[in-house]
Amino acid sequence: MSKQPSLSYKDAGVDIDAGEALVERIKSVAKRTARPEVMGGLGGFGALCEIPAGYKQPVLVSGTDGVGTKLRLALNLNKHDTIGIDLVAMCVNDLVVCGAEPLFFLDYYATGKLNVDTAAQVVTGIGAGCELSGCSLVGGETAEMPGMYEGEDYDLAGFCVGVVEKAEIIDGSKVAAGDALLALPSSGPHSNGYSLIRKIIEVSGADIENTQLDGKPLTDLLMAPTRIYVKPLLKLIKDTGAVKAMAHITGGGLLDNIPRVLPKGAQAIVDVASWQRPAVFDWLQEKGNVDETEMHRVLNCGVGMVICVAQEHVETALNVLREAGEQPWVIGQIATAPEGAAQVELKNLKAH
């Protein structure tokens, strides 16, 4: 008889009971997000979802994303309640730019050692994000992987599927010189540029947990969840039919994201003086001595979404967005791009 002790999965660092406890805790979160098209609850091998009624030629739109190294800041600050909102926002905001209504969302949560309380906070945030975007949380994967992650550190990924009527896909092909560009404000850096943000904090030696800007803790400003624009934008599309293109301003800022939805030969002229940049961006620029163009190439600088409409629809679009609770403004317009010119020109850049 071998004297070798009997090994279990728990001895190897995987706690099946903890995983099951987490599933029980998050079932109610998923239930709150349920859409009528979703068939069944959590726990099956696959999630089933019907196409909503009323579509003649439905086209499915998919997207996947993470939250970048904002997650490292969340871990350092032990703040896990809103990072799930960020995860959903990064996916659903990408879907809505082509006119798609988000249908369902799945998440992937990988960790070295599963902390049920932390994971439940994260998934509760994911549920909140799904509710804000009218999307169902239909499943996910929680992977406890000892030896792959340090202690209770975790990584997150999200996956979302939406639907749009084929004839109503918004692809930027109708954008023309003279069109107006509208902007919607961000809540802060959203989920991009955090490797630079963390480097600025490190190099400057700033005590972010004891710093306030405009009477608000800096940590709250840096961790403010990414805004979810789905419902106001779907209302704008439905009520006006005027949207020609939309750009979700993520990694790469205005300079890299607006060109993704512009046809060849079009140039966006953006007036940087058209909005007051939130104080958190000025703080980051000052502490990191960051060049002005670099700021706009890495961070959203206060702009979360850009919308293109014809000039005759500007006032209607602004009013619909205001009625939906947004604070839109005209940020620029479309011009014919000069030969060899960049597709985005930033006007009135402040001297650094």
From Swiss-Prot:
| GO MF | ATP binding; phosphoribosylamine-glycine ligase activity; phosphoribosylformylglycinamidine cyclo-ligase activity
Transmembrane parts of this sequence: none
One GO cellular component term of this record is: cytosol
> What organism does the UniProt record list as the source?
Pseudomonas fluorescens (strain SBW25)
Q: In which pathway does it act?
A: Purine metabolism; IMP biosynthesis via de novo pathway; 5-amino-1-(5-phospho-D-ribosyl)imidazole from N(2)-formyl-N(1)-(5-phospho-D-ribosyl)glycinamide: step 2/2
Cystine connections? none
Q: NCBIfam families, per this entry?
A: purM (TIGR00878)
Instruction: Kindly list the places in or outside the cell where this protein is found, as annotated in its UniProt entry.
Output: Cytoplasm
Which gene specifies this protein's sequence?
Answer: purM
Alphabetical keyword list: ATP-binding, Cytoplasm, Ligase, Nucleotide-binding, Purine biosynthesis
| Enzyme Commission number, as recorded | 6.3.3.1
Q: Which GO terms describe its biological process?
A: 'de novo' IMP biosynthetic process; adenine biosynthetic process
Keyword Aminoacyl-tRNA synthetase part of the UniProt annotation: no
Name of the protein? Phosphoribosylformylglycinamidine cyclo-ligase
- Its catalytic activity? 2-formamido-N(1)-(5-O-phospho-beta-D-ribosyl)acetamidine + ATP = 5-amino-1-(5-phospho-beta-D-ribosyl)imidazole + ADP + phosphate + H(+)
Q: What class of enzyme is it?
A: ligase
**Family under the similarity heading:** Belongs to the AIR synthase family.
SUPFAM superfamilies (UniProt xref): PurM C-terminal domain-like, PurM N-terminal domain-like
